[in-house]
Amino acid sequence: MKKLILLLLFIPLLGFGQNLEKEKLQSVVKTFFEGFHNKDSLLIASVIDSKFYLNSTSFKEDNGVLRNINGDNFVSAIVSRPDSPVWKEKLLSFNIKIDGPLANVWVDYEFWVDDKLSHCGVNSINLLKFF
């Protein structure tokens, strides 16, 4: 009975730790997009690995298309883009799954260009925790 009571005392702490990790992951994603919007390569670099890469999916003639983009090229394109038109990616909701050092952050978004909705979709971001 003592073991059961002790276990029940720690269950809420386990959930709290998971929520704290989710908050940290959400903060990482928000920091990335803050750097994206401000064309700040240092801010972006503070939350990505040097081996970062981006995959982009789309449809062409009803077929799925996958593009692989080198992270350095992506960041260079973001920070060197002109000030106009203004890009704004609005992050709408976060669904975060964590398993050990691996996390997936699923983020619904709207992409606006000069205050006009361009498109919407989902960012699926895989993150790895380095100990």
Tell where the protein language model's regions lie, with residue ranges.
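Sec-dependent N-terminal signal peptides
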Residues: K3-G17
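Short, low-complexity N-terminal intrinsically disordered segments enriched in polar/charged residues
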Residues: G15-S46
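Short, solvent-exposed loop/turn segments at secondary-structure boundaries
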Residues: L20, L117-S118
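Short, solvent-exposed secondary-structure junction/capping segments
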Residues: K30, E34, I48-D62
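Hydrophobic pocket/interface hotspot
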Residues: F32, I44, F52, V105, ...
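Surface-exposed, charged secondary-structure patches
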Residues: S58, L66-K116
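Short beta-strand edge/turn micro-motifs at domain boundaries
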Residues: N104, C120-F131
